[in-house]
Swiss-Prot record:
This is Probable chemoreceptor glutamine deamidase CheD. Its EC number is 3.5.1.44. InterPro entries: CheD-like_sf, Chemorcpt_Glu_NH3ase_CheD, Cytotoxic_necrot_fac-like_cat. The keyword Hydrolase applies. Belongs to the CheD family. It comes from Burkholderia orbicola (strain MC0-3). Probably deamidates glutamine residues to glutamate on methyl-accepting chemotaxis receptors (MCPs), playing an important role in chemotaxis. GO terms for biological process: chemotaxis. The keyword Cell division does not apply. Keywords: Chemotaxis, Hydrolase. GO terms for molecular function: protein-glutamine glutaminase activity. Residues 204-247 are annotated as: Disordered.
Amino acid sequence: MSALPIATNRYFDNHFERPGVKLLPNEFYTTAEDMVLMTVLGSCVAACLHDPYAGIGGMNHFMLPDDGADPGAAASESMRYGAYAMEVLINELIKAGGRRERFEAKVFGGAAVLAGMTTINIGDRNADFVRRYLALERIRITAEDLQGVHPRKVAFMPHSGRAMVKKLRLQVPGVTEREAALAREADRLRAARTRAQVELFAAKRPAAPQPARPRIELFGGRGTTPGAGSQAAGSPYAANLSRKQEA
């Protein structure tokens, strides 16, 4: 499993009049600075964690890969990836002086923005995961804006814990295309894993035993070794064959 990268797209936000960082899918960022963390979500989810006592916070942005397993199965690959994305954020905040028992969470995203996804709603899957994970970790959710059909623009102030969300129109240039690409990549990886499992299964199957060749006895042969289709020179049977061929 590759490391979750730290967001590096820093800029100055004129609206909030402070430095900012834009997060892309599968990135995270933590800080104690008075700045704004910004991201745009479709079916992906973002968890914003804040320690009000230490004045630090952070955000992640991720989508669970669809590995074909039960979404609630703790051992599935998608659940392991989601847990990893959350653990990276939590551990980085703890390293910076935060305390897990003081963390408060605000969660966003999980919209149904990908048309044609009839077998599973990726947004619902992501929203369900982040709720259950935080409940298991006993991190209180103080605000949420999850699911629905609209993409969202989220702004989070990690120093104060303040979060704002703006619903976007259904078709936002770049958002649907980006998440469709993520879904296609997840499907490709899933298909590759399935092929690898089939090949591994085939390689492990024991080879079928070869049937024993029937022994053929020679009629009237002396001092000969039985063999399939072999005729001993000088045997009566060989002589009979010669006479039939001459006739």
